[in-house]
Swiss-Prot record:
Residues 60-117 bind DNA. The keyword Transcription applies. Its main location: nucleus. GO terms for biological process: positive regulation of mating-type specific transcription, DNA-templated; single fertilization. Pfam families: MATalpha_HMGbox (PF04769). It is found in: Nucleus. Residues 235-256 are annotated as: Disordered. Residues 244-253 have a biased composition (Basic residues). This is Mating-type protein MAT-1. Belongs to the MATALPHA1 family. The gene is MAT1. It comes from Cochliobolus ellisii.
Length: 378
């Protein structure tokens, strides 16, 4: 029997490089001689580590482009939509899609672009360039004329948001008239765009035949071009949906307008009520200014007090010319028991009040004495 073959250096290096850390520690413990341990350690330092290649994960298949997404990417360029942000146009694009009669064509175009993208990548297959080539070929309406051709009118509601209204007596455009009686497949679309220079590196799979195609018979052509059947049945259903939606929106808008009008009327009525109450308050409030003087009734007593005060003030003013220390007749501080004529410096401010002729010697005793006003009030 042949003896065991000694492993080569490459085999030893591969063996050591594929060991785990715990296995390497066990090998180190098995070597007892110091020289052998040194040689083993030096060998470990020179070994090139083996790179573990992770298992290849199959690339996840990309999601195919949705027909509505393709429609939105193409017709978002409608010139009337430029002033508005995308969040305000989302509902409008959905409304256009519901009434669009070319949904089958958009499904074919979306599938064709998805096949090209999956092979060459999204960077090598720009979606806007793809639509710019194939849409005019299929005679789809240009974004600049789409609203007019399909009977749509863009307006603004009371909230300032854009809104679409269907024009009465308008007939939506059908699919491309030049291709209405031809069978159209995904491969036909890919072949056309490649001839136009789009995605030249794409290689179609000869064994893959797409079951997706679009075809119209001559009878369908007659039905579309006949005046009595100018609108397809599907388009009529879409129009009925749009009309129902517009009626619901108009009803909600009318309710909002009625509510706003009622609120405005209530506010005006409340304002008028406040104004009337303020007018009543102003009428009842006396005018601003000094307090009026009290209206006292006339009585003889108050009239006599008033005359006495006024006469006393007049006497004080008229007595200002007499000498200082003179005893005046109207001085209430003099002694009543002492005769006026016996006073020194006696003076009176009533020279014309007393008739002294009645008191001279030999005077007529029947002479009339002066009359004093205060006797009548005694």
């Amino acid at each position: 029997m042949d003896s065991a073959r000694a492993p080569t250096e490459d085999e030893i290096a591969k063996f050591l490089a594929t060991r785990t850390s715990s296995q390497m520690l066990q090998l180190m413990r098995c070597i007892k001689q110091p020289a052998a341990q040194f040689a083993f350690t030096a060998k470990l330092l020179t070994i090139t580590p083996v790179k573990n290649t992770p298992p290849t994960v199959p690339e996840k298949a990309k999601k195919a482009l949705n027909a509505f997404v393709g429609f939105r990417c193409y017709y978002i360029a409608i010139p009337a939509f430029k002033p508005w942000p995308m969040k305000k146009l989302s509902n409008l694009i959905s409304l256009l899609w519901e009434g669009d009669p070319n949904k089958s064509l958009w499904s074919l175009m979306a599938k064709a672009w998805s096949n090209i993208r999956d092979q060459v990548g999204k960077d090598q297959a720009p979606l806007d360039e793809f639509f710019g080539i194939i849409c005019p070929h299929l005679e789809l309406p240009d974004p600049a004329y789409y609203l007019d051709l399909h009977g749509w009118s863009l307006g603004v509601n009371q909230e300032g948001d854009p809104t679409l209204l269907r024009i009465i007596d308008s007939k939506p455009a059908s699919i491309g008239i030049g291709h209405i009686n031809l069978a159209l497949s995904v491969e036909d679309i890919i072949t056309f765009v490649q001839k136009a220079g789009f995605a030249p590196t794409y290689t179609p799979d000869a064994n893959d035949t797409s079951p997706t195609f679009l075809g119209q018979s001559l009878s369908s052509t007659f039905e579309v071009n006949h005046p009595a059947n100018s609108i397809p049945a599907a388009s009529q259903v879409d129009q009925a949906r749009v009309a129902a939606r517009n009626r619901r929106r108009a009803k909600r808008q009318s309710a909002r307008e009625l509510e706003f009008q009622e609120k405005l009327e209530n506010d005006l009525e409340f304002k008028e009520k406040i104004n009337r109450e303020m007018d009543l308050v102003l009428e009842r409030t006396p005018p601003a200014g000094p307090d009026p003087l009290p209206d006292f009734d006339f009585t003889p007593f108050y009239e006599g007090v008033n005359n006495l005060i006024c006469e006393h003030m007049a006497m004080e003013q008229s007595n200002a010319g007499y000498p200082e220390g003179a005893h005046l007749f109207n001085d209430f501080g003099i002694d009543s028991s002492k005769a006026y004529l016996g006073m020194d410096n006696f003076a009176t401010d009533m020279p014309d009040l007393i008739d002294y002729d009645a008191f001279r010697l030999g005077a007529n005793e029947d002479v009339a004495l002066p009359v004093f006003d205060d006797i009548a009030h005694a």
